[in-house]
């Protein structure tokens, strides 16, 4: 039985060697199975070596042939592994599920990193765990580079006193909560409402007065109607008194002061009284006014009224101007 097993091993050795050398593109699983079967056959042959060795030696060197065949099987398995390891991968990105743990791996890094976008091929090693750890540690490093800076590195600008003053000027500080939420009583609310209505009414009346009599800022003091002085009053008075109605028109139209106009009125009234007396006591007009005394009295009273009106109004205006000397740009209008 032992001789038959050794012959079977010797016969199967060359066939296994030829199959291992002739099929280098077989999968890793076939090479591994051949290696395992060769090891099992070698172990069986080594256990029964003493009787088999004698048989092989007696049979013309069958024992060395079996040893050579087992060695050839091991060499063929190694060549098969090398050929499989050197075979190019048609698809680098796809991993073959039939390959064992000693195959090739492709580590995919962060796609956002343009500098490391190409695939990195790692050689087959027995311990790929440190490389995976290194790749995993490089990925968080890239993520931490894009993270925001810590809060301690951010500098906060403290507003200065000038900025605070400017902010307080444009944005006043609101009152405290106790003051803002405290409601006034009914009497206080009514008083505040009455005061607001009075202020609004005063403002409305002042606005209406300004609209009705707008101030004329385009006039200067020389163009305004001023009071005048006593000299202008006497000049206009004598012009109207001497030249009668012609002097009255000239003095009233030329002068632009209250004194000149009231002086012209006063002089014209006195001139009218003068001519009434002349006509009454003259011998030239005895035939015209002897029976018409009422007409004389009418002109005499009219002259007296004009004289006293001009003189009295001028005195009132002068006294008023002296009492209101502090008022600036005041205008006086008096009707004749």
UniProtKB/Swiss-Prot annotation:
Principal place of residence: membrane
Record key words, sorted: Endosome, Golgi apparatus, Membrane, Phosphoprotein, Repeat, Transmembrane, Transmembrane helix, Ubl conjugation
Cellular component terms per the entry's GO annotation: cytoplasm; endoplasmic reticulum; Golgi apparatus; Golgi membrane; intracellular membrane-bounded organelle; mitochondrion; multivesicular body membrane; perinuclear region of cytoplasm
Residue ranges annotated as Extracellular topological domain: 253-257, 309-336
Tissues in which the UniProt entry reports expression: Expressed in brain, lung, heart, skeletal muscle, kidney, liver and placenta.
GO molecular function: WW domain binding
Residue ranges, Cytoplasmic side: 1-231, 279-287
Reported modifications of this chain: Ubiquitinated by NEDD4 and ITCH. Also ubiquitinated by NEDD4L. Ubiquitination by NEDD4 or NEDD4L does not affect turnover. Undergoes transient tyrosine-phosphorylation following EGF stimulation, most probably catalyzed by SRC. Phosphorylation on Tyr-151, Tyr-171 and Tyr-177 are dependent on the phosphorylation on Tyr-167. Also phosphorylated by LYN and FYN.
Segments of this protein annotated with the region Disordered: 1-24, 37-156
Modified residues (Phosphotyrosine): 151, 167, 171, 177
Subcellular location: Endosome membrane; Golgi apparatus membrane; Endosome, Multivesicular body membrane
Motif (PPxY motif 1): 148-151
UniProt feature, compositional bias: Basic and acidic residues: 78-99
Superkingdom of this protein's organism: Eukaryota
Region span, Interaction with NEDD4: 148-151
TM region(s), chain numbering: 232-252, 258-278, 288-308
Induction line: By T-cell activation.
Classification via InterPro entries: NEDD4/Bsd2
Swiss-Prot/TrEMBL GO biological process terms: metal ion transport; negative regulation of gene expression; negative regulation of protein transport; negative regulation of transporter activity; positive regulation of canonical NF-kappaB signal transduction; positive regulation of protein ubiquitination; ubiquitin-dependent protein catabolic process; vacuolar transport
PANTHER family (UniProt xref): NEDD4 FAMILY INTERACTING PROTEIN 1/2 (PTHR13396), NEDD4 FAMILY-INTERACTING PROTEIN 2 (PTHR13396:SF4)
Domain comment in the entry: The PPxY motifs are required for E3 ubiquitin-protein ligase activation and for ubiquitination.
Protein role: Activates HECT domain-containing E3 ubiquitin-protein ligases, including ITCH, NEDD4, NEDD4L, SMURF2, WWP1 and WWP2, and consequently modulates the stability of their targets. As a result, may control many cellular processes. Recruits ITCH, NEDD4 and SMURF2 to endosomal membranes. Negatively regulates KCNH2 potassium channel activity by decreasing its cell-surface expression and interfering with channel maturation through recruitment of NEDD4L to the Golgi apparatus and multivesicular body where it mediates KCNH2 degradation. May modulate EGFR signaling.
Oligomer and partners: Forms heterodimers with NDFIP1. Interacts with HECT domain-containing E3 ubiquitin-protein ligases, including NEDD4. Interacts with NEDD4L. Interacts with PTEN. When phosphorylated at Tyr-167, interacts with SRC and LYN SH2 domain. May thus act as a scaffold that recruits SRC to NDFIP1, enhancing NDFIP1 phosphorylation. Interacts with SLC11A2/DMT1. May interact with phosphorylated EGFR. Interacts with KCNH2.
Protein name per the record: NEDD4 family-interacting protein 2
Organism: Homo sapiens
Lineage, highest ranks first: Eukaryota, Metazoa, Chordata, Craniata, Vertebrata
Name of the gene: NDFIP2
